């Protein structure tokens, strides 16, 4: 990733003729990563639900919405924003998700220690979404639309699960469910937003 970023900066200082094809390649690469993570996110949510026991997975069950500090799903107005602003919002959300996914993994290690596959999937998801966030920020910088400031402190976000642990096991499972769901929503939204920058992409 760092080598790719360095190459972008080198091409940008050389000339727009050599820079644009390289930027297009970076956008395609990042879009492909987002598309792959969208599929992984669907699998992660299914796997998470399978490991939580009833009532998770039962027909008609809809977990209550619990607040998550520093992160919510894409707003309805997101699609009407300029692409650069959408990508800024994507990058901000992606920067928060690794800490949340790590917190879910730690809680699941306590609740489901015999679910190593789920724990590995959560660990992989945190690492992969961190890579996607860095790639989106690289694209933004190359477009001259860098992300605006840092996201919430990871420690503050992670303590959400500690603070809610006193509310019981069910609440912890619901929080994990929503984190996995938000992970899927944001990587899917990122895929769609990047797709509008890919030549021949669909809006």
UniProtKB/Swiss-Prot annotation:
Lineage: superkingdom: Eukaryota
UniProt record, GO biological process: neuron development
InterPro entries given in the database record: 4_helix_cytokine-like_core, PRF/CT
Keywords recorded for this protein, A-Z: Cytokine, Secreted
Expression sites by tissue: Highly expressed in heart, skeletal muscle, liver, lung and kidney. Lower levels in testis and brain. No expression in spleen.
UniProt-annotated location(s): Secreted
One GO MF term: cytokine activity
Keyword Secreted: yes
Signal peptide per UniProt: none
Gene Ontology CC terms: extracellular space
Tagged with keyword DNA damage: no
Predominant location category: secreted
Gene3D superfamilies: 1.20.1250.10
PANTHER family (alphabetical): CARDIOTROPHIN-1, PTHR21353
Cited function: Induces cardiac myocyte hypertrophy in vitro. Binds to and activates the ILST/gp130 receptor.
Family statement drawn from the similarity comment of this UniProt entry: Belongs to the IL-6 superfamily.
Name of the featured protein: Cardiotrophin-1
Species this protein is from: Mus musculus
């Amino acid at each position: 990733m760092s080598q790719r970023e360095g190459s972008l900066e080198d091409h940008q200082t050389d000339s727009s003729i050599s820079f644009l094809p390289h930027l297009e390649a970076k956008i395609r690469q990042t879009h492909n990563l987002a598309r792959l993570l969208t599929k992984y996110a669907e699998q992660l949510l299914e796997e998470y639900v399978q490991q939580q026991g009833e009532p998770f997975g039962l027909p008609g069950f809809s977990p209550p919405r619990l607040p998550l500090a520093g992160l919510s799903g894409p707003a309805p107005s997101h699609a009407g924003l300029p692409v650069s602003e959408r990508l800024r919002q994507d990058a901000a959300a992606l920067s928060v998700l690794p800490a949340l996914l790590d917190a879910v993994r730690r809680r699941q290690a306590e609740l489901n220690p015999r679910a190593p596959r789920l724990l590995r999937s959560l660990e992989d998801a945190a690492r992969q979404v961190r890579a996607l966030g860095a790639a989106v920020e690289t694209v933004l910088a190359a477009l001259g639309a860098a992300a605006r400031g840092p996201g919430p402190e990871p420690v503050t976000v992670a303590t959400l699960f500690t603070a809610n642990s006193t509310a019981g096991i069910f609440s912890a499972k619901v929080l994990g469910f929503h984190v996995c769901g938000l992970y899927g929503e944001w990587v899917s939204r990122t895929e769609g937003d990047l797709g509008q920058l890919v030549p021949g992409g669909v809006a």
